[in-house]
Curated annotation (Swiss-Prot):
The gene is EGD2. It comes from Encephalitozoon cuniculi (strain GB-M1). The keyword Transferase does not apply. Keywords: Cytoplasm, Nucleus, Protein transport, Transport. This is Nascent polypeptide-associated complex subunit alpha. InterPro entries: Nas_poly-pep-assoc_cplx_dom. Its main location: cytoplasm. It is found in: Cytoplasm; Nucleus. GO terms for cellular component: cytoplasm; nucleus. The lineage of its organism: Eukaryota, Fungi, Fungi incertae sedis, Microsporidia, Unikaryonidae. Coiled coil: none annotated. Signal peptide: none annotated.
Length: 157
């Protein structure tokens, strides 16, 4: 099991488990729910398959909502403005010499430069919304399998 169930979750599990068979879905890393134009991430998900059906019971904390239309508009605006001007994003504001800030050098992220999943537009979009270093943005993108919304949510925690 990925994590222990809370008291309320355990009660629901026992109640439903007695009536229908529940089979844990192993190695669940992320669950997202899209309701109309809003995407929610389920934090620390635990999922069970209800035997004899195609249904899944999900336990976890509902993350902050993300308006997909608004995010798409911001992304398109970011691409348009980056084509118009090559101004710095938030990650460009960070000093090139980390000793100036008294900050240790961040761990370098090794990413294949020919990997088409990593785009400069995604990095610029995230940097316009979240104050983070370029390396942190790339690391969040890689860890979230290049999902911009998930990467932004990881960086805002």
């Amino acid at each position: 099991m990925a994590r222990a169930l809370t008291t309320d979750e355990s009660h629901i599990h026992k109640t439903l488990g007695a009536k229908v068979g529940l089979e844990e879905v192993e190695a669940v890393e992320r669950i997202a729910i899209v309701v109309k134009d809003t995407r929610y991430s389920v934090e620390s998900p635990v999922a069970y398959r209800i035997k004899g059906t195609d249904s899944i019971l999900i336990f976890g904390d509902l993350g902050s909502p993300v308006n997909l239309h608004q995010l798409k508009r911001m992304y398109e605006d970011s691409i348009r403005s980056s084509k118009d001007q090559e101004g710095p994003g938030l990650y460009d504001e960070i000093h090139s010499d980390p000793q100036e800030d008294g900050v240790k050098e961040a761990e370098e992220i090794t990413v294949d430069p020919s990997d088409e999943r990593l785009s400069e537009e995604d990095i610029k979009l995230i940097s316009s919304q979240v104050k983070a270093s370029r390396n942190d943005i790339i690391k969040a993108l890689v860890e979230s399998e290049y999902d911009v919304v998930d990467a932004m949510m990881k960086l805002t925690k």
